[in-house]
Structure formats: C-alpha cells, structure tokens
Amino acid sequence: ILKKSDVVDAGALGFVLIIQGWLNSFQKSTKIQSHHLNISYEHSKIEALKKDIDFTITNKFCTECSIVGSNINRLELKEMVKNLGDSMVVAGTKDRVKIHIHTNTPAKLYKICSIYGKVVDRKVDDMTKQEHTVHHTGSSGISIVVDSGADIPEDYIDDIEVVPVRYSFGNQQHIDKVTQTSENFYKQMAIDSNHPKTSQPTPGDFSKIYNFISSHYDSIVSIHLSKKISGTYQSGVNAAKKIKVKNIEIIDSYNASVGLGLLAMYAVDLRRDGKSFNQIISMVKEKRDKTHVFLVLDDLKYIVKGGRLPAKIKTIADLFRLRPVIGTKNEGQLKARGVLWGRSNMESKFANFLGSKINNNFNYRIMIAHANSLKKGNRLLELLLKKHTNIKEHYLVELGGALGAHSGPQALSIGIQEIN
C-alpha cells in the first residue's frame, strides 16, 4: 500500500543515502555532491501541507526540571502534577527524578516539585513563540530579539523573541517572568531573608535562541540591556560570532525595563512598515537617544541589598525623607536624576518631575511599569495624560524581576520616547 501511494520511509531512505555516499566516496575518492542524492520536493506542496495541519497549542510552555532528594515517591508526584498539562514524563530514581510536561503554569509545577526536594535544571520553552517563528508570514525575514530585562506589553510580546534573565532567592532558582509571576516575586521579596540575585543570560542561552531563529529568518536584530548595567549585551555579542545567519546585529539599548521595551516595540513597528535590516538598525540607534527611563523607589533597602547604592545614601535619604529618582544617562549608566521630597503623594510628585522631561513641541509614547503597585501605576498614568495632551500612546505593565530585584516592591518605572 505504501509503495502504491508513493510513500517512503524517510529515515530508512536517509540511511541508505548515507551508505551510498560512503561507498561513492571510498570507491571513487570523490566528494559527495548534493545532486548525487536525487532528492527533490515541491515547495508549494509543503506550504499547503503546513496550512492543513492544526498547530493549536493548548499548553503553552514545554517545561522540564530535575528533583534531587531522598526517597522520592514518583507515583505520588505523577498524581500531583498530572492535571497541570499534557505530554507528561516522570522518570528517574528515588534520589533524582526528571520531569517533562507541557503546561500553562510552570510556577505551579516547580512549587509542587519543591515539596519533594531541590529543584534544579529548570528549562521552559514557549511553544507558541516557537510556532509563531516557524510559521511567520509576510515579506520580512527579520527577527527582533530582547532579553527579559525589557518590559513589554501583551500587544507586542508575540512579535519579539526573549532571552530570559534568571534570578534566585537563595537556592530557589527562577526564570524571569516564566516560573514566577511578578506579583509573587514582589510578595516573596518582601518577606524572604534572601535578597534575589539576578544572573545575566549566558552566551549559550543566546546561542539557543539565535540558532532556532536563524533556521527561519534571514536576519536578527537583538536589542539588550545597557552594557553599563549588565553583561547581557556582551553575552549576545559573543554568541553572535558563532551563529550562521545572513545578518545579525547586537544593539546596546542604553536603557532598561520599559525603556528597552519601547525600543523593541519601535523595531517591531519598523519591521511591520517594511523597513530593511540596515534601516531598522540605523533608526533604532537614532531612537535610543530619544528614549529615556526613570525609576522612583518606595524603599531604598532593596537597591542597597542589591549593591547598587551605598548604605550611607539610604541613611541620609531616610533622615530627610527623600526619594531619589534614578534614570539612565551617559549612554546607559544608571544615575540619580532628581529627588522627590516627602513620603506622601509619590505619584503626583513623580508626575511633576516628569513634566520637565516632556517637551510640548514633540509627541510621545510612554510606558509605565509598576512593582506590584497597580493602583499607583494607574494614578501616575492618569496624571500624565491629564497634563500632557502630546502623549499619543501609553501602556501600563508589570515591572519584571531583572530591574525589580533592585527596585523592590511598590516602585514605579516609566519609559518616555519621542515619536514622529
């Protein structure tokens, strides 16, 4: 039946072709040429087949981890996690168990696993992003990449590939914005004696993303945290040297958080408008000088614990009831950009401070990020929109762990970008 239907066992055929190639090489001392293989296919048929296949993904994240413990009850563990998703595999010994599952709630999985021992080797892949990359449509062969130090609204997240930043509370490891919600991150930060420590993506993390993208796109524009804040940019540069792709550019954003997010969104807009690879690079680099991020903290103890501020500065600020405004300056260096006096009405005082940064002769796109302080974020947005009619686009998002590890709960960050 298979022969009549012109169906071939692809694996077996591939093995036969390998053997044939070896024989030709040994017997004739000739290099194997692709035309010897006599393989062809009709591209239109492949594309038609892809359209006929249902790629609906019920559970978004391909999630893996290992549990290191003693006397791990694998049957009980299976019962605990089986309702979290599908494609579940639980295997190992009583001292070490490996889990694979497709789920929408990696954080729940890891929380259950922590009951049985130390959770290590965490890995989470967003399958919807992978599907979007594989089946992207349109004339653009340009992929936009950021690290998770960028805070980005839902409207844009599907159009951007993200290399994750990791953080840990003591021995408890997390993947930023994946294995723990921002809300739970700030709740834990407020009560955990272990201050969260962030770790930049490694060149290996970048290589994994770049290699996958390069099989589906011709060009990559990768925009990252300021190199004066993090080594993330350099990791991207190192990984890019080993990637086989037609065009790749690693850009220092001079920014963080929502500032970096705004630049990534701008790059997506340019791609949608049909701009070329070189045009996107040039225009993003020009726009980064017109994109600024500002951050006001509710409590300076977190930035002191994170090593970004001397303890004596906190002592002085607390004594005089001051709240410094921190922002990027000098091509991405975090610096004090101003001071808010008093502890009350932070949003109103911050809005007044930002008024001096918004020029009435230009239009703006802004994005506010809140650290488990949605009410404050909405209030700040309301004040700015009321006062500045030249704010043409606005977004409100949660502040991720990359910057939140230093800002602490109740902080507010804003990105301001001049637009045409």
Language-model segments: what does each one mean?
Residues 143-205:
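N-terminal glycine-rich anion-binding loop in soluble enzyme alpha/beta folds
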Residues 105-122:
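Charge-rich, low-aromatic oligomerization/scaffolding segments with amphipathic character
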Residues 201-236, 240:
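Active-site cofactor/cluster-binding pocket
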Residues 188-192, 217-222, 241-253, 396:
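Glycine/charged-rich beta-loop-alpha catalytic/anionic-binding loops adjacent to active sites
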Residues 1-96, 130, 137-141, 149-168, ...:
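Mixed-charge interfacial surface used for oligomerization/domain docking
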Residues 18-19, 146, 222-226, 252, ...:
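Short beta-strand segments
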Residues 120-126, 130, 134:
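N-terminal accessory regions of nucleic-acid-interacting proteins
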Residues 95-103:
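A generic structural motif
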